């Protein structure tokens, strides 16, 4: 067994050290299991793998609650073993996505800031309690009086709330995670109504909690050594389209500063997950903007590049999700990066209250947008789940400025990312200020629906599809008598229908 004695500072806790197999045996059919992790960072690995192995001879089903997406040791292993009955609140795993879209796993797509409190409120489907929390740690501290402090690793996610709410806690002490991570975290769980108070954070750099998750030792059912690394993913190359979107964003920001709608160092930035979002942030590295602040959920390569360039003052998030190369860079210089980074529970990092208070600039990606400014972030052709809404809604409705990015084309030009009407709506026209593509910037603030349509078709849509979109809009205006939001109901989803039938949205 892996030696974790130097990581466990509480002598009484050492008596609870056991194998992954013994810990997995504690999990029973029908349980609600809350795990640490947010993106493939800071999630338990040994116990889920042992549970998947056990299920080969002892089948069972669990309801799996996470922070967001997690690594393959959970989502692939448990899905392929038939263990997952229900899953929430976000995922990016191919095996799990297939199971969701064929109906074998029931999936609840939630705003990420809502998850922990919904569990505490008893709003979840079926049985409401967290039966067992499985949390990855780099250190277990002795707080005295039968209390320990769980020092998380590369993410916070919902760990603080899971530990507080769970009947039992399993801790995986991962020796591949550096002990130097201690001090980066800020664990805080808000009170629930009717006793809720304002979250006492007014700047991205504020610390309002503890550097560990407090836990009663009597709750800890098992402590499991682990030496499996985070399965972080490589990000896509920054292509010409991504560079163009980044340049368009920087030009827009410069105009906003010139018009005195933004300060010279902008406002706290929030950026979604993925290659496009990372590429857009990377566009700021070579810009003139300095003394930037970040209040986001996921800290990707672009954020580290801003730190390295001396342009970032503080970076607040709930998870580190760098590429493998960037993770190595971080691990070799943890002490320096710690000066800039704060990891918080997603209930705080994604808090709508805080997004509005500090004036976040929300920047997220879209699968498609329609001519009136509605955004689809989650479904292909309105039916097949891609990933989930994630934290985009937490920030979009409550930020100072809300920006969505999309390339004008997808699938080699077979799909227009601008359509007459979104096949699924995650963010309504009321929540969208600006849409950016490689072609330009559509500033929708203060415009009527018909004005928005003209700007989006002109600035965002690809010339290949502009004639079709203009034709639809003009005929809709005539057919509806120039009404507030013109649509031809029999044709509103015609682009999608044509793609499903012919493989292209072109006529």
Question: Each PLM stretch: what is its role?
Answer:
Residues 2-507:
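Conserved alpha/beta enzyme-core scaffold
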